[in-house]
Amino acid sequence: MSEPFPIRFDLVTFDTPSTEVLAAFWSEVMGLTESEREDGDRWIVLSDNQGIRRLGFQRGTHRPGGTHLDLVCSLDQFDAERVRLLALQATETRPVRRESYGMIANFVDLDGNAFDLCAYR
């Protein structure tokens, strides 16, 4: 039997000049609560009540790039979740598309980080 892989995934971290603003946005999007905070607002971590889903926000230079998050919901929740994201001030970057696998909407958050809302068949 082999040893477990020594590296494990911990959290996704956003570099942002506005940790509290971006953490509040993602808290509403994902239903996560603040679980860690260091040096005022330099470092904030959100997590679910089991500590499994975690997002980090560290004060730093904002560098949106080619990486994005895929958020998944059911097809019957897709329209309502899309409206909720827009109400939270996410910006839709392309029209909603129907694909072979289901529906997709492309967004950026308040700092310009890309994420998709997907609903699979």
Over which residues does each language-model region extend?
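Short beta->alpha junction loops/turns
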Residues: 19, 74, 97-100
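Conserved active-site tyrosine of GNAT-family acetyltransferases
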Residues: 22, 26-27, 85, 112
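Short hydrophobic/aromatic beta-strand micro-patches
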Residues: 13-15, 70-74
